[in-house]
Amino acid sequence: VIEREIRRVYDGVRPALEQAGLPPRLWTYAVRHYCFVRNALPVEDGRSPWEARHGKKCKAQLIPFGALVHFKPSPARARIIPKFAPRAQPGVFLGYHLNPGGEWKGDYLCALLSDLRGVNDDPKQRIFPHRIKEVVFDPKQIEYPMRKRYEEINYQENPPPLTLAGANGQPEVLGNEQGDQDPGGE
């Protein structure tokens, strides 16, 4: 039974990451988001698992993982926003912050688009989500801002060749290029 539930989570998280255009290394956020939303949605009897556990309906705004949202950044980040720039900044929705015991106090997790700019290109890039109380999201116009770059990297018909810097600092092309010698000596 538990293996089936784990598989259900995997089967829900994989397409969520793909749809959002976010790399698999952000699976921890996707798993938490999937489990939260799954528990907040009603089941056969019309009640949600959240309602059964907490005795009341979940008041969270249910937002797709990786969807475009607007939010006011944390006070430290808000100080660097230009004076006449909009206070709400575009970002990507990463989920819900839960306290120990699964209690939700109204905090959402989001990352600024500017902080995610290279997340699909650089596997070492760290992200620092903002824990915020208010998110602006339009369910009639769902957008996934990271999707385009994800598709460019993962679904190119002619992906760029693998390169490494040569002895002179210039890139060298590796692979089956014209003039490559067969490793067997022929």
Residue map of PLM features:
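Nucleic-acid-interacting cores, centered on viral/eukaryotic replication and modification enzymes
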Residues: 1-186
